Amino acid sequence: MRKTFFTVIFLSAIFFVKAQNNTLLQADFWKSNPTLETVKSEISKGNSPSEQNGGFHDPVTMAINNRISNDVIKFLIEQEGNVVHKKTHHSRSYLQWAAAAGNLEIVKLLIDKGSDVHYKDSYGTPVIAYAASAG
């Protein structure tokens, strides 16, 4: 039991350190309002466009929440590992994040790609209610 506990702690620490090294998971990166070229450059350096941090945010959610250019968001959604039904922080979908941010272009794109408009997050909150609660 003790060995299992330490193994879990060790693996968790490795995951945490790895996530912290991914530029695309750093809040400061998104606060700088990066261009599509900058994001592509970071990916070419080995930064994962689909990895999640410890809070289950990924580059797509971070880009949406920081109101980054829709060209960047569209590009990230197309990357391997980023499917429209991917569960993120609190099991929220990209559609919930985009609706809450008031990003109608991305909302339409996600619906066109098959995102479930009736999906509920881990709190049982549907897309429309989450969008309304976000203002």
Which residues make up each language-model segment?
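Ankyrin repeat domain, specifically the short helix-to-loop turn at the C-terminus of the second helix
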Residues: 40-48, 74-83, 108-116
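Ankyrin-repeat helical core positions
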Residues: 30-31, 43-44, 64-65, 77-78, ...
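Ankyrin-repeat intra-repeat helix-capping/turn positions
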Residues: 34, 67-68, 102, 135
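Bacterial Sec-dependent N-terminal signal peptides
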Residues: 1-25
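Sec-dependent signal peptide cleavage junction
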Residues: 18-44
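N-terminal adaptor/linker regions at the entrance to substrate-recognition repeat cores
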Residues: 103-114, 120-124, 132
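Conserved ankyrin/ankyrin-like repeat signature
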Residues: 38, 68-72, 105-106
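Ankyrin-repeat boundary/"N-cap" motif
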Residues: 21-30, 51-64, 85-97, 119-130
